[in-house]
């Protein structure tokens, strides 16, 4: 703590001091609230809404509204908010993050700002990390809101769109971050306004805010459909990958190294950078790939797919580990969530990595998915007018919260002082010695009936410790990837006397571990970490499971110099130091140098991960601006707006572009290339061909005016073919919607390919993000032009008797973060399928070439 903090207190302490007068006002209202009958207390909601209509602000209502919720919670749940919980509620209402230690009642805190902000009638979202917590909190805390006359909904993974719509229309909705994000994306893929499920994003309270906005922010949300590409190349590249030899690089090729002209000396066929999770082919490796595929130059654009797939195969073999990153179950590769250690059914790695792993594991390779819609959590949550967050650990990432989300962190004091003892790390030379020490420590605690929670990073380690404990005859529970409903129950029982629980990472987070009298007397819950995590914050989360509400407890991490964290950040040097000191087997090492090395390694990885998230955001910021434009245009079409003027604008833009491309002011009209102009424009707008007589003596602008007049008259003639003008208006909406969706989905894929290839510009001393922005701008403009041309072309060639109905452009097959496969938005029933439509079976072929042919042959 620096001198300023010692004299004036930390920033959090100063913020809490500022909030205290408000807390006193709430406390002073307590006797008044206690006198009210249930009916009078409920009537406060109507009173507050009326005052808002009359011009009062939420801040004006805060003391009384909070006092109302406090009294309601006491009557309904038998729980009254502590002073520190009132402080937390105020911080959340202000759109900040309240750091509250485990067991301080964060769930109850959320009832205060959610009630106050729900009074505006725009909806409040309380966001949690899993369905179990969303349902539990909606059931328990929802009682308080219902008592006060508000409606409460919950959105769960298996709900149908109509159930979701009903839940989102409630005053307060409990929902997971994944469901919330995917519903937003799905809403921007629906074909009828009535299919929308969400309202505008007004205010949200994010529980476990660090987990959602930081840990999960490295991967964007992706909704995917099936691509038509063959899977053969994955299997071929897998065979080649196993023949290539792994080498080493003399040093990393950084941007600075490239600028300075430093040469990187590489051995073998490929090198692996485990820190950044990157694989690169060496010059020798490139030659082997070219020879294997009988191609001249791997870098040629037509060989991009081979290059991409061989890198994927090498990543699958060298960076993706079975029983750590994924498991193979029932002939299927299933992802393991790196933050909870749970299997995620229905979730697949995108961009072909999942297929590469399937080829590696010799299971059936499924077709690659095509991205239909995507968004990062950073950009999604920044769409809210206001957001607040709660967690037990946020201060270490305060800079990121402030820079990316414009949220600052306020540390809320605990209701009772923390009694937990956090012991120094126990460090051993090898993993074997470390695990022996862990088992010995569990054994000692178990003998005196002290409950133990052992935290592991991988499934493999949890199963290893389980086997070792079985050999010692110590009964225990294991919580890893096999998610089941009993998980929360097992975690809740982890504080009972003699209980031993092994949990992968933070399974069961959000569930309180309560002690009984025997375990309290034995020293409280003992936390054993079997490895330091990449992030100090996640280590602190594990520690925070013990010592809730002033309970006793202790925590200690057991580390070996063979652990991944140490191995990646130079433990060879430390290994040599301690070998020379002659450390005996099973002897614990204690040295200042070790503590520093561990902290430095974590800081490096945290900085690295921040870089990954920042990089993702820099690129997605470009996508976000484009996404906003497309989604706004789409919503106008869905809202049933009259698109006639927009279509006329498209027609005139197309004429302008064609004239500008083919005619020049600098040459006489006799020299204009009329053939080129006719072929460019007439395939879109079927005007009469331009002849030399028509253009003779005319200026370029004159021609623009004449052609526009003719094009507009032609469109008016098309309008007159329809008995009802609204028929053509609906056709305009249908065709425009189809064109937007089709082009936007292709554009998402093109942008991803661009992003992957743009990194090479760093070697040319150019900023990749700037290059990406420039290229993305050009690509977006091309896409807009393409949408306009497609729409106008179809409208000029449509016939009155043609029946064109709205339909989804692509079939949704899954998402990358859902707990199960994704639901397709409800479609109108009995949609007629026409010969040139995509076949409903999802084959990607036209109906007439697929099921339509079978039907015709019957």
Kindly give the residue locations of the regions a language model identified.
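Small disulfide-bonded, cysteine-rich extracellular recognition modules and tandem repeats
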Residues: 10, 842-844, 853-854
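Short alpha-helical segment immediately N-terminal to, or the first helix within
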Residues: 91, 839-840
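Short, Lys/Glu-rich amphipathic helical modules
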Residues: 449-462, 639-641, 692-696, 840
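Short metal-coordination and nucleic-acid-contact micro-motifs, chiefly zinc-binding Cys/His arrays
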Residues: 834-837, 843-846
């Amino acid at each position: 703590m620096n001198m300023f903090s010692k004299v004036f207190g930390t920033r959090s302490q100063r913020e809490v001091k500022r909030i205290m007068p408000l807390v006193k006002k709430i406390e002073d209202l307590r006797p008044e609230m206690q006198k009210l009958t249930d009916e009078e207390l409920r009537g406060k909601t109507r009173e507050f809404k009326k005052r808002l209509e009359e011009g009062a602000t939420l801040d004006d209502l805060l003391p009384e509204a909070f006092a109302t919720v406090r009294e309601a919670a006491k009557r309904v749940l038998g729980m009254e908010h502590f002073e520190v919980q009132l402080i937390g509620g105020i911080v959340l209402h202000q759109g900040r993050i309240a750091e509250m230690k485990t067991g301080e009642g964060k769930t109850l805190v959320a009832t205060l700002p959610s009630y106050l902000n729900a009074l505006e009638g725009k909806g409040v979202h309380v966001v949690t990390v899993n369905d179990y917590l969303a349902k539990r909190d909606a059931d328990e805390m929802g009682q308080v809101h219902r008592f006060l006359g508000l409606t409460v909904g919950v959105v769960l993974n298996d709900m149908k769109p109509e159930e979701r719509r009903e839940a989102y229309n409630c005053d307060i909705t409990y929902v997971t971050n994944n469901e919330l994000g995917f519903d937003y994306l799905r809403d921007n893929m629906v074909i009828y306004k009535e299919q929308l499920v969400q309202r505008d994003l007004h205010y949200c309270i994010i529980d476990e805010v660090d987990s959602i906005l930081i840990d999960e922010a490295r991967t964007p949300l992706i909704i995917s459909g099936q691509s038509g590409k063959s899977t053969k190349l994955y299997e071929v590249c897998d065979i080649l990958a196993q023949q290539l030899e792994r080498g080493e690089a003399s040093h990393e090729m950084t941007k600075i190294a490239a600028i300075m002209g430093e040469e990187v000396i590489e051995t073998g066929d490929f090198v692996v950078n485990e820190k950044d999770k990157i694989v690169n082919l060496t010059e020798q490796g490139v030659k082997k790939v070219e020879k294997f595929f009988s191609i001249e130059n791997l870098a040629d654009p037509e060989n991009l797919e081979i290059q991409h797939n061989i890198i994927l195969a090498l990543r699958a073999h060298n960076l993706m580990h079975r029983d750590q990153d994924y498991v193979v179950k029932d002939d299927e590769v299933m992802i393991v969530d790196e933050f909870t250690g749970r299997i995620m059914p229905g979730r697949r790695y995108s961009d072909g990595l999942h297929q590469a792993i399937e080829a590696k594991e010799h299971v059936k390779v499924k077709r690659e998915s095509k991205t239909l819609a995507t968004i990062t959590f950073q950009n999604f949550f920044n769409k809210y007018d206001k957001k607040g967050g709660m967690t037990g650990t946020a201060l270490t990432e305060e800079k990121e919260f402030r820079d990316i989300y414009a949220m600052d962190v306020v540390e809320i004091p605990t209701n009772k002082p923390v009694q937990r003892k956090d012991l120094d790390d126990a460090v051993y030379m090898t993993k074997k010695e470390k695990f022996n020490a862990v088992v010995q420590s569990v054994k000692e605690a178990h003998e005196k009936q002290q409950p133990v929670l052992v935290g592991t990073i991988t499934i493999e380690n949890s199963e290893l410790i389980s086997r070792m404990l079985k050999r010692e005859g110590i009964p225990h529970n294991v919580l890893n990837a096999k998610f089941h409903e009993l998980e929360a129950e097992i975690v809740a029982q982890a504080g009972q006397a003699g209980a031993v629980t092994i949990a992968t990472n933070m399974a069961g987070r959000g569930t309180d571990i309560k002690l009984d009298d025997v375990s309290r007397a034995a020293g409280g819950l003992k936390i054993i970490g079997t490895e330091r995590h990449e992030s100090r914050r996640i280590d602190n989360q594990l520690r925070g499971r013990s010592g809730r509400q002033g309970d006793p407890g202790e925590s200690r991490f057991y580390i070996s110099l063979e652990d991944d964290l140490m191995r990646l950040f130079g433990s060879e040097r430390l290994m040599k130091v301690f070998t020379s000191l002659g450390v005996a087997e099973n002897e614990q090492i204690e040295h200042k140098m070790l503590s520093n090395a561990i902290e430095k390694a974590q800081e490096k990885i945290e900085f690295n991960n921040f870089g990954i998230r920042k990089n993702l955001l820099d690129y997605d910021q470009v996508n976000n601006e484009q996404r906003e434009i497309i989604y706004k245009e789409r919503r106008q079409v869905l809202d049933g707006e009259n698109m006639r003027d927009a279509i006329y604008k498209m027609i005139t833009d197309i004429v302008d572009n064609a004239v500008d491309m083919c005619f020049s002011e600098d040459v006489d009209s006799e020299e204009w290339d009329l053939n080129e102009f006719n072929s460019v424009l007439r395939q879109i707008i079927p005007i009469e061909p331009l002849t030399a007589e028509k253009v003779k003596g005319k200026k370029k602008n004159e021609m623009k005016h004449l052609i526009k007049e003719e094009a507009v008259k032609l469109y008016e003639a098309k309008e007159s073919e329809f008995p009802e003008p609204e028929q053509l208006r609906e056709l305009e909406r249908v065709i425009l919607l189809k064109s937007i969706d089709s082009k936007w989905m292709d554009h998402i894929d093109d942008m991803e390919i661009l992003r992957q290839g743009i990194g090479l510009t760093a070697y040319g001393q150019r900023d990749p993000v700037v290059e990406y922005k420039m290229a993305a701008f050009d690509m977006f403009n091309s896409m807009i032009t393409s949408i306009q041309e497609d729409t106008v072309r179809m409208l000029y060639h449509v016939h009155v008797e043609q029946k064109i109905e709205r339909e989804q452009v692509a079939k949704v097959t899954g998402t990358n973060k859902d707990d199960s496969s994704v639901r397709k938005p409800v479609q109108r029933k009995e949609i007629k399928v026409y010969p040139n439509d995509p076949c409903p079976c999802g084959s990607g072929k036209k109906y007439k070439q697929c099921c339509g042919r079978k039907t015709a042959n019957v």
